[in-house]
Amino acid sequence: FSSKTIPILAILRKNLLADINTRVLYTQDLPSCFDADTIRSVYGYRFELAQLDSADSIPPFDGSTILISHEDEMNAIDLDPNVDFYIGFHSDLGSILLVNEERNKDYVSDIQHVRRRETIAMTPANALDALKLLVDKSLVHTIKTNVQGNKTSVLNSLKEITGTETKPLVASSGLSMQYAIMMGLIDDAQQNHPNKPIRFVVPTNCYGGTNDQARRVAACLDHVEIVDLAVDGDNDMVQSIDKVLDKIALEDAVPLIIAEIPTNPRVEVPELVKLKEVLCKQRITAS
């Protein structure tokens, strides 16, 4: 994976839906991007977290055990029988996930689906570096990346081209960006509208990845549901959003709309001014 956290999240997601306990063990420091409190509160995942002095002796556990280690070299790993998943963090490339034994083979397809729906596996450049490391371990000290410099250049170019001071955000793929936005919106809604249900409004004919991803998020959180938005046939976005927002207002829920405009040619907006009016309209809850 190009990500250090996604392989952990993929296992946590499957175990949440299967009601399986998860133990996350680590021997060094956790990556700064792994915020245990946020993962529990926003994603709804359940797990125990513990640091080990040594990975030589790991006690048994009623559930799945994830062992995290920092490995810049790609060596053969002798997995402890009490470890179900081994995740090796690489400083420049991301992470490598090893699945232990036959008892966990049914996790593989679910983990692969996370790579299709929530993120990417690995960029072509990183994949090439990883293959080189498999052939020659000495290359671990020669991998040079300028990710931060490249990001700065891209962000500056976006501001220059668009003529705005708004902070741009970039991601390795559209779905990974959308996933980050969705979880960020859930976090924001929980902080600013605590204890209120959340409704993601999704066009019924939008791209399969978008629809599937939204439903995968909702499947993990009891207070999040998907509301279908009819936008084709005799329906247009303005009329449909007006009806949907009235319904969500009666539920006193937080509406979040995934629009896909203008990338989806089937989503029609006849009049932008009326769309603005519908989005700005004050609505009344049932109480």
Residue spans for each PLM region:
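Conserved N-terminal alpha-helix of the aminotransferase class I/II PLP-enzyme fold
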Residues: 1-199, 203-243
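Secondary-structure boundary elements
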Residues: 17-19, 247-252, 277-285
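Short, surface-exposed, polar/charged, turn-prone segments marking secondary-structure boundaries
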Residues: 51-54, 227-231, 254-255, 279, ...
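Catalytic PLP-binding core of fold-type I/II PLP enzymes
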Residues: 65-69, 84-86, 256-258, 268-287
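Glycine/proline-rich, positively charged
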Residues: 234, 238-276
